[in-house]
């Protein structure tokens, strides 16, 4: 399949059932704060199922007074599916390696669209900056990470200062972005072409307005001075993902950034996130260097 099909949740659930079954067998030197609201329940758009996050913290006190580095992880699912509870293994693995992990839910399409999803992610980031010290994290060392559609949303957090300013962050706090087979980096070009059968499904989250497609495509927000990016691309992923990621990297290079760009041979799209169950892989190795863990 060549088209851009982004991690339907049913397929992922089948793939991770063994991982979840063994989660409690694996040593987990971490603490988990579950279902923490990141939007006030008095807010008119508060969603008790989607405006929540989990925080995974190392059990040991941070070696630095400021606290552990922080990674905010955003799940994928074609912008229409997905749940933080599938990704407990990522939170556990990061905490085991000296990182405070924040794994979030956000509202899905329909009924909302990508701008509302990006706003939810920005609100989760604002909550993280304000509260992460309570969980042993350093608010001055916050990084974002996402897989599939979550990668595109994470890239928006790293590039769209105006979005963050709307949600209480006048200065962008993101210190780096980890892209795990990201989708949605250039939906403007993708939706203009409509090359593959079924591409109209992406009009559900992105709507019919090309101006909105461009506004929600982080590739058009690249400029000098952005935080560092690192990329991990499956050698057998969808051409749209490898293509847009390569163009994103090239635009970053034109600004003077030299983003590490790792192609993992033989990896399809879903295994690019499933491999994070195992602690010893190249994604964690490079991530830990980036965040200074």
What are these regions (language model features)?
Residues 23-64:
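N-terminal cap/lid segment of alpha/beta-hydrolase-fold proteins
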Residues 38-44, 81-85, 90, 102-139, ...:
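Catalytic nucleophile-loop/oxyanion-hole region of alpha/beta-hydrolase
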Residues 41, 188-221:
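Mobile cap/lid helix-loop segments that gate and shape the active-site cleft of serine hydrolases
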Residues 65-76:
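Short beta-strand element of the alpha/beta-hydrolase
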Residues 126-192:
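Primarily recognizes the serine-hydrolase "nucleophile elbow" in alpha/beta-hydrolase
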Residues 225, 230-233:
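Short beta-strand/loop motif that positions the catalytic acidic residue
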Residues 232, 246-249, 253-293:
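C-terminal catalytic histidine-bearing segment of alpha/beta-hydrolase fold enzymes
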Residues 238-246:
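Conserved alpha/beta-hydrolase "acid-adjacent" motif
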């Amino acid at each position: 399949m060549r088209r851009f099909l982004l991690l339907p949740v049913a397929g992922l659930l089948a793939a991770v059932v063994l991982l979840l079954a063994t989660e409690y067998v694996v040593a987990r030197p971490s603490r988990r704060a579950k279902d923490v609201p990141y939007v006030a329940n008095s807010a008119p758009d508060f969603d008790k199922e989607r405006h929540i996050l989990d925080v995974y913290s190392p059990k040991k006190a941070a070696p630095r007074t400021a606290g552990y580095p922080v990674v905010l992880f955003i799940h994928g699912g074609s912008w229409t599916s997905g749940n933080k509870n599938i990704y407990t293994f990522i939170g556990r693995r990061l905490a085991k390696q000296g990182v405070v992990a924040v794994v979030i839910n956000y509202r899905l399409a329909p009924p909302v669209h990508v701008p509302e999803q990006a706003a939810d992610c920005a609100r989760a980031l604002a909550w993280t900056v304000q509260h992460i010290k309570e969980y042993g994290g350093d608010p001055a060392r916050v990084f974002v990470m996402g897989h599939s559609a979550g990668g595109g949303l994470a890239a928006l957090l790293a590039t769209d200062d105006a979005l963050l300013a709307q949600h209480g962050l006048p200065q962008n706090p993101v210190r780096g972005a980890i892209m795990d087979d990201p989708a949605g980096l250039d939906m403007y070009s993708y939706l203009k072409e409509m090359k593959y059968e079924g591409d109209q499904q992406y009009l559900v989250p992105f709507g019919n307005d090309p101006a909105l497609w461009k506004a929600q495509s982080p590739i058009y927000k690249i400029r000098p001075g952005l935080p560092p990016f690192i990329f991990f691309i499956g050698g057998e992923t969808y051409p749209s993902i490898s293509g847009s990621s390569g163009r994103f990297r090239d635009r970053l290079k034109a600004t003077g950034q030299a983003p590490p760009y790792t192609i993992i041979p033989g990896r399809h799209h879903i295994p690019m996130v499933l491999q994070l169950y195992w602690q010893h892989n190249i994604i964690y190795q490079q991530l830990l260097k980036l965040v200074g863990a």
